UniProtKB/Swiss-Prot annotation:
Residues 1-32 have a biased composition (Basic residues). The gene is TSR1. One of its GO terms (molecular function) is ribonucleoprotein complex binding. Belongs to the TRAFAC class translation factor GTPase superfamily. Bms1-like GTPase family. TSR1 subfamily. This is Ribosome biogenesis protein TSR1. Present with 1390 molecules/cell in log phase SD medium. Residues 82-248 form the Bms1-type G domain.
Length: 788
């Protein structure tokens, strides 16, 4: 059939019309009902920057980065340049760190390196002529987990040894990697020293090498490969990297001065003490003779003087430029710096008698209370109670503020009521009415439910009372609604047990005095270091330390440390075991209320209760602390809920009294454990947050009762208290229920602690009546941990 054609099997629609500009009607339909939002500005006019100015600024920043890099490289250059510190850490047992070192040095073809010297020492200096570089090699004690952390702490490079035969143990080798990552690691390299044990031919070694590279990249994604030290080219590349690459910095470590001792000597100046002489090269921001130093496992000490043996390359350049200025030249050529009257003391607390007790309420005494404290004040006899202002939105006038009620502002005050606040009020009333009707039908004639308000109250016999109480508590244990719930024994007085607790309308909006009068507060509370603004103070102190440094990075010095004679027996040969000295910043030896962020270690599944002794390593210190755990929330009044346990998968705040740290260093929490392969159990990790004495921790206690009889909104409650005087004492504290109702105690009934309560709606028989009480938890002092 000529001219016949079939329909296309593909349907292609026409292109939609795309106008260049939308019509007015389309724009109206698009923006219908929307209100134009005024832009929020800073109040400053926008400064127009031309393209040429932007290019010039970028050029200046690039030039400054290059200049900083050149200055940092000068630290390690030259004959007297500082040695790069290399720590060798094998991750498996079948590797010998000395074998790794021997294969690295062998490729240098340097006859000046003595292998016998390598075999006899664990810490030594090596000069690589081929790359004109100095290296300080540290081989840690692989049986001591903390010594590995200490050696990696001062290292510029960490060389991780991997095995082609043995897998990395999750309980030891992998924990080393994770701990070093959390502590802070400068630069790292992965090497394999026994790949030939897999197979003699290289092509059969490839799979194992790729598997190890994948494993290493899992922890260090920026590292593309691991090196086979049995190949001379790979070993040479590793050595070249160690000698020529500029190591990354660790902020918290490099913001203080530190020295790895080459020589240690003691000069006796009195029968009980003398000068511990440390010789080494300065790293970090430097030292000042008026500041204290810290020696791990020994403590804090004062400096008597600092002697310079040789200048750093940076300082020699500065001296050369200042040769025309005689005064500056004289200061720069000074080689001995002695401490003076302005040096820091070793006092951890402020002297006694300097406390300021003006903030304390002298009239307040717990023994003078006639009822429970509510909203941060106690009802004292003959004392006027000041009215508190309600929190209102910003910009509200005094007249408008009168219309804001406390119950409206604090509607979300209780954590248990949050899950029900979104429910519709009408539906809640209908449900309650239906529930009450259903209960009344089911228990018709039951003596436990009283419909008549004027029906007489009958007390149960002691045996029946005990039986019903036992049944109620057995049922309660099956479904605990409130984690902070406490139970009172029938013979126990609620007044005596909960006398220091108070009621609050809203925990995060209350007015809680920081320096309140409390017999349970630490004796040294008013003598602690108090910092108004931690962040600004930290920046100022670090800046001042850099400017006041008398010995800077690269200087070779002798430090004369005032040292007691009885500690000499603990000092070991610095060529066999790492001996490091760290400079302390101003005020860092003083105790303060410090806060750590804390997250549980993934592999640790044991409970960690508050106030249990644990060891924390933060920065250069290790302390045994008894931390108080709290929620890491940001509350406007700096009052936070105390937590009894460290919960998994959450970040908590640990509070204690310990020396302050101005470098915001990472923290590792652990417990000594002789049965563990590492001799310690890693509990958690975090960061030093701040030093804040105004952070208040409130421990919550929830008393629960059983709704016993109902009449409209009046309910008879039992099992919350067991004495009528307890009911009268806590009568001022509001009540709440698990369904979101709120109420108050109306009157006490009988002698067994029953009481009538009025609520803002009807309750059901399945409801639980509760009362929240709060008590201040005070941080506890800490002690240095010496590894025992």
């Amino acid at each position: 059939m000529a001219g016949h054609s079939h329909r296309s099997s593909l349907k292609n629609g026409h292109k939609s019309y795309k106008s260049k500009h939308a019509s007015k009607g389309a724009l109206k339909r698009l923006y219908k009902g929307k209100v134009e939002k005024e832009p929020v500005g800073t109040g400053k006019p926008d400064k127009q920057v031309s393209k040429l100015q932007r290019k010039n600024k970028a050029k200046q920043l690039r030039a400054q980065r290059i200049l900083d890099s050149i200055e940092n490289r000068k630290l390690f250059e030259g004959k007297n340049g500082a040695a790069k510190i290399i720590t060798i850490v094998p991750l498996v047992n079948d590797l010998d760190p000395l074998d790794i070192l021997y294969k690295l040095l062998k490729c240098a073809d340097d006859e000046g390196i003595m292998v016998q010297e390598v075999d006899s020492k664990r810490i030594f200096n090596v000069h690589i002529k081929k790359f004109k570089s100095n290296l300080k090699i540290i081989i840690p004690d692989m049986t001591n987990f903390l010594n590995i952390l200490d050696c990696a702490k001062v290292a510029d490079f960490v060389v991780f040894g991997l095995s082609g035969v043995q897998e990395v143990d999750e309980e030891f080798g992998e924990q080393i990697i994770r701990a070093l990552e959390l502590q802070g690691i400068a630069s790292y390299i992965g090497v394999i020293s026994n790949l030939s044990a897999v197979h003699e031919k290289e092509k059969f070694q490839l799979d194992v090498k790729q598997s190890l590279e994948s494993y290493f990249k899992h922890f260090f994604p920026s590292e593309e490969r691991v090196y086979n030290l049995e190949k001379n080219s790979d070993a040479l590349n590793v050595l070249r990297t160690l000698c020529q690459r500029l190591p990354r910095s660790i902020n918290w470590r490099d913001n203080r001065g530190y020295v790895v001792a080459d020589f240690v000597d003691f000069v006796e100046t009195s029968p009980d003490s003398g000068d511990l002489v440390i010789e080494g090269t300065v790293r970090g921001i430097g030292f000042n003779a008026n500041r204290l130093v810290h020696i791990p496992d020994f403590g804090d000490f004062q400096l008597n003087k600092i002697e310079k043996i040789s200048e750093s390359s940076q300082k020699r350049k500065i001296i050369k430029e200042k040769a025309t200025d005689s005064l500056s030249l004289e200061l720069d050529l000074q080689t001995v710096f002695e401490s003076n009257m302005n040096r820091d003391t070793l006092d951890e607390y402020a002297p006694e008698g300097t406390e300021d007790w003006s903030d304390y309420d002298e009239d307040f005494e717990y023994d003078g209370l006639t009822t429970a404290r509510y909203d941060d004040h106690g009802f004292l006899p003959g004392r006027e109670q000041t009215s508190k202002k309600a929190a209102v939105p910003k910009g509200t006038s005094d007249y408008q503020a009168k219309w804001y009620l406390d119950d409206v502002i604090d509607a979300n005050e209780e954590e248990e009521a949050e899950q029900t606040n979104g429910k519709d009020e009408t539906m809640m009333e209908i449900d309650d009415e239906m529930m009450v009707e259903q209960d009344n039908e089911e228990v018709a004639g039951d003596e436990e439910y009283d419909i008549e308000d004027n029906e007489g109250f009958e007390e149960l016999s002691p045996e029946e009372e005990e039986r019903q109480l036992r049944e109620f508590r057995d049922m309660e244990k099956e479904d605990r609604e409130f984690p902070d719930e406490i139970e009172l024994e029938p013979s126990e007085s609620a007044i005596e047990r909960l006398k220091r607790y108070r009621g609050l309308k809203n925990l995060y909006n209350c007015d809680w005095q920081v320096d309140e009068k409390d017999p349970s507060s630490p004796a040294e509370w008013k003598r602690l270091l108090r910092i108004g603004n931690y962040k600004n103070t930290k920046n100022r102190i670090i800046k001042e330390t850099k400017n006041e440094a008398q010995a800077i990075a690269g200087d070779r010095i002798r430090m004369f440390i005032r040292f007691p004679k009885f500690l000499l027996e603990k000092i070991q040969d610095p060529k066999q075991l790492l001996f490091a000295v760290y400079g302390l910043l101003l005020h860092e030896h003083k105790n303060a209320v410090v806060n750590f962020s804390l997250q549980r270690w993934e592999q640790y599944d044991k409970p960690v209760p508050s106030q249990e002794p644990i060891v924390v390593q933060y920065g250069v210190r290790r302390y045994t602390i008894q931390p108080l755990f709290s929620q890491g929330s940001n509350s406007p009044n700096n009052v936070h809920k105390y937590e009894r346990f460290l919960h998994p998968d959450t970040v908590s705040v640990a509070t204690c009294i310990a020396p302050v740290d101005f470098t915001q260093s990472p923290a590792i929490f652990f417990k000594p454990s002789p049965t563990d392969a590492k001799n310690i159990e890693l509990i958690g990790h975090g960061t030093f947050l701040n030093a804040d004495h105004s952070r208040i921790l409130a421990k919550r206690a929830i008393l629960t009762g059983h709704p016993f009889r109902f009449h409209k909104t009046v309910v008879t409650v039992r099992y919350m208290f067991f004495r009528p005087e307890d009911v009268e004492w806590f009568k001022s504290i509001p009540l709440f229920t698990k369904s979101g109702r709120s109420g108050f105690i109306k009157e006490s009934l009988g002698t067994h602690g029953y009481f009538k309560a009025t609520f803002d709606g009807k309750l059901s028989a399945q409801d639980v009546v509760a009362m929240s009480l709060y008590k201040r938890m005070w941080p506890m002092p800490s002690l240095p941990w010496n590894g025992m």
